[in-house]
């Protein structure tokens, strides 16, 4: 009939019986317990569905000119060189350089060793003039040192995050979830093995507990999930390509707008 057949024993420990051992040796393994059998069937169906997916080709990412530079500026440049949507930043280390072509801007410390800039007063938002920028830079320099970054303010949106950790056995494992200052509190993330397509990234996003937040709440427009998934897929190809050179990457937040998304902060551990 072409239907698959499984040998299942309802009694625990049956796998040690002579008939079970001989059957297994002949290529017909006996599954020990109905629960184990059902889990196995579920896994087989999941694998069947996985093989049946036609997500299309992976994004093309050219890393021939990409370089892993120091600090946040270096991380953002690596992502920008790989085609990801990154906010432009200007590094400064003296007051005379603390100027911008357009306002409002954000000023962030670039002092080494500070992972959470907001916790130490290392981020000043909505700076509206050159005078305000100089005052903010003077204050930040006095507390945290002269290294800083200036970037244009980015439109509001839903704050998401992307990350990767390299497991010694499985290689890079990518994280997708809700980000921003509440990332560690929400802990709403899913994991995926790179590389993958935007369609797979969308399936990951749909598994998040707070997925509905991306659909717009109380009059706010829906977020551009497609743009975020495109960025996640491109990021997955990047980290898979550089798997032997990068141990960790944290991108938080990725601000997902009504149209498009923007990476505003990143850290690379090579």
Positions of PLM-derived features:
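ATP-dependent carboxylate/acyl-activation modules
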Residues: 1-270
């Amino acid at each position: 009939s072409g239907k698959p057949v499984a040998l299942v024993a309802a009694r625990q420990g049956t796998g040690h019986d002579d008939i079970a051992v001989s059957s297994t040796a002949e290529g017909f393994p006996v599954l020990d317990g109905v629960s184990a059998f059902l889990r196995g069937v579920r896994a087989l169906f999941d694998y069947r569905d996985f093989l049946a997916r036609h997500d299309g080709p992976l994004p093309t990412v050219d890393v021939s000119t990409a370089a892993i530079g120091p600090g946040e500026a270096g991380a953002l440049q690596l992502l920008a060189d790989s085609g990801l949507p990154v906010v432009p930043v200007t590094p400064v280390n003296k007051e005379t350089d603390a100027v911008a072509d357009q306002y409002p801007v954000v000023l962030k410390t670039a002092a080494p060793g500070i992972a959470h800039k907001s916790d130490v007063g290392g981020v000043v938002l909505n700076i509206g003039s050159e005078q305000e920028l100089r005052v903010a830079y003077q204050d930040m320099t006095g507390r945290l040192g002269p290294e800083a970054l200036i970037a244009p303010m980015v439109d509001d949106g839903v704050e998401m995050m992307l990350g990767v950790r390299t497991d010694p056995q499985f290689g890079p494992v990518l994280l997708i979830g809700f980000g921003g200052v509440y990332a560690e509190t929400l802990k709403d993330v899913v994991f995926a093995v790179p590389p993958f397509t935007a369609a797979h990234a969308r399936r990951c996003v749909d598994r998040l507990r707070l997925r509905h937040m991306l659909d717009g709440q109380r009059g706010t427009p829906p977020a551009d999930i497609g743009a975020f998934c495109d960025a996640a897929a491109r990021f997955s190809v990047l980290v898979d390509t550089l798997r032997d050179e990068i141990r960790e990457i944290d991108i938080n937040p990725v601000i997902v707008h009504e149209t498009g998304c923007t990476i505003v902060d990143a850290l690379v551990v090579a």
